[in-house]
Amino acid sequence: MIEDIKTLREEHVYRAKLAEQAERYDEMAEAMKNLVENCLDQNNSPPGAKGDELTVEERNLLSVAYKNAVGARRASWRIISSVEQKEANRNHMANKALAASYRQKVENELNKICQEILTLLTDKLLPRTTDSESRVFYFKMKGDYYRYISEFSNEEGKKASAEQAEESYKRATDTAEAELPSTHPIRLGLALNYSVFYYEILNQPQKACEMAKLAFDDAITEFDSVSEDSYKDSTLIMQLLRDNLTLWTSDLQTQEQQQQPVGEGAEAPKVEATEQQ
């Protein structure tokens, strides 16, 4: 029985890798979902027992699969929403209604995928996690997918999902700051995406800048001790943090320069932040 589970687990991993190479991310996500649901804790073993958690490779495959499955639809949602707004501005209400219907279809797909991975994280993965790195990784993922839900939800739904995202990011940050070095790529990626959450969802650009700058400065201070394995990933994420800081600082300065009496000024356009892929 145990040998059968091991073979099945290896098959799911191989299917996920095949799907990744073919850029068929929905099927990649399905393979990893099947692995999580059917290949963990099959021997009624206690949490933390060998085989009860995802390996680093499996964890990364899961992340890549759902990130890309959601990412394609997030891009579609932005395009369709823009078209819908343009049709409304032109008073083409029939076209606007068609665009709105299509947008709703994409939102339903987005919500389904986000809820699916959130269920896996909450019910299957986090309860079995015993090491700090995986705990940070999974709570960061929870924050990310609640953030994605916030992007397309109505006001009430946005508030609820933003609160869940905030809680998840906070729990990830508490563990990361206590257990992981400031140069660790997972800790840096968490700071990157958490700061994007403050900028794009909570509309707190000053807080986003402070968070990104603190993570960057802390990593610079300890950069001499970065491990060889982490060097490439850490430097890449630090560059993304710096890029966002540059964009956000410029945006804040522009808004300050454009400040005028109420009713006379226009809101400065938002720059789009970069998050960890």
UniProtKB/Swiss-Prot annotation:
Q: Which domain of life is it from?
A: Eukaryota
Q: Which residues form a coiled coil?
A: none
Map out region (Disordered) in residue numbers. Answer: 252-277
Q: Which InterPro entries does UniProt cross-reference here?
A: 14-3-3, 14-3-3_CS, 14-3-3_dom_sf, 14-3-3_domain
Q: Basic and acidic residues compositional bias: what residue ranges?
A: 267-277
PANTHER family annotated for this entry? 14-3-3 PROTEIN (PTHR18860)
Please state which protein family the record places this protein in.
Answer: Belongs to the 14-3-3 family.
Annotated protein name in UniProt? 14-3-3 protein
